């Protein structure tokens, strides 16, 4: 396994997923679900999923996700965009599932919270490029640890209300 390739593949989804939280600092936020409920009577995604967060996640993931490739040339801008946008989509899917399971916003849901963004990013990206299975397995192993650590840092920085 080429560790440089591995880390440059997981970097855009990590950045996209981690940077969307900065939208919480904005004064005006617009929920992706417009405050509407699904057919089960519960919110579709919840207040924590906003258009601003989606835009920040995709833009930051694409730009910062591509940036190291100016040196290493592993993925292109399109690749960084696909990985970032699909990571944000995966996070939305995770929020949708959590709402269906009656979990409130911020409630921990292992391994859904830790892997939804990454597995969706890899699934969508694999429609365009081949991803070695060993990369997916390695990412599944290390992501929960990295996710927990970065969430704790975001909590300490008061970007998140919960440390998970």
From Swiss-Prot:
GO biological process: glycerophospholipid biosynthetic process
Name assigned to this protein: CDP-archaeol synthase
The reaction(s) this protein catalyses: 2,3-bis-O-(geranylgeranyl)-sn-glycerol 1-phosphate + CTP + H(+) = CDP-2,3-bis-O-(geranylgeranyl)-sn-glycerol + diphosphate
UniProt superkingdom: Archaea
Names of the cofactor(s): Mg(2+)
EC number(s) on file: 2.7.7.67
Cellular component, GO, one term: plasma membrane
Main location: membrane
MF annotations from Gene Ontology: CDP-2,3-bis-(O-geranylgeranyl)-sn-glycerol synthase activity
Keyword Transferase: yes
Origin species: Pyrobaculum aerophilum (strain ATCC 51768 / DSM 7523 / JCM 9630 / CIP 104966 / NBRC 100827 / IM2)
Pathway(s) where this gene product acts: Membrane lipid metabolism; glycerophospholipid metabolism
Function field: Catalyzes the formation of CDP-2,3-bis-(O-geranylgeranyl)-sn-glycerol (CDP-archaeol) from 2,3-bis-(O-geranylgeranyl)-sn-glycerol 1-phosphate (DGGGP) and CTP. This reaction is the third ether-bond-formation step in the biosynthesis of archaeal membrane lipids.
Pfam families (UniProt xref): CarS-like
Localization: Cell membrane
Family to which this protein belongs: Belongs to the CDP-archaeol synthase family.
PANTHER family xref list: CDP-ARCHAEOL SYNTHASE (PTHR39650:SF1)
Residue stretches spanning the membrane: 3-23, 55-75, 77-97, 122-142
Lineage per the UniProt record: Archaea, Thermoproteota, Thermoprotei, Thermoproteales, Thermoproteaceae
Membrane topology reported for the UniProt record: Multi-pass membrane protein
Keywords from the named record: Cell membrane, Lipid biosynthesis, Lipid metabolism, Magnesium, Membrane, Phospholipid biosynthesis, Phospholipid metabolism, Transferase, Transmembrane, Transmembrane helix
